[in-house]
């Protein structure tokens, strides 16, 4: 509402489901490079970032956009992310996509989730990336306290059974 008051135009916010390619758009905005794992790699936070967009009726030039293309290069193209991915040989989607799938899992999908112990998401390609490792080795943490609070480093079936609906 404040943006609309300031500019006198309409604005729309998006995250995860967007009419734009979030990674490409973020790279065009200078927020990082696109890795071979198709994730944005930010110099300060690596690939552990959340991307959101604000679209508006305001011409991009009025907001300072100069029409640049995304930064190319940066990714080492070393193949470590693809080599580490547990789904490469299966021909299935990324394990993160499988864990977030709506509806029933196939027996093969369920087997991969069990094998890799993933309840939600997968960071294997990210943690194998040398560029992301540099960031984590520097100890860079998110400034958003919410993401650090009450983290569970190892999820067990016992822990799941102990959780309230809210915790889950």
Predicted regions and their residues:
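Catalytic cores of enzyme domains
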Residues: 1-154
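Glycine-rich phosphate/pyrophosphate-binding loop
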Residues: 149-168
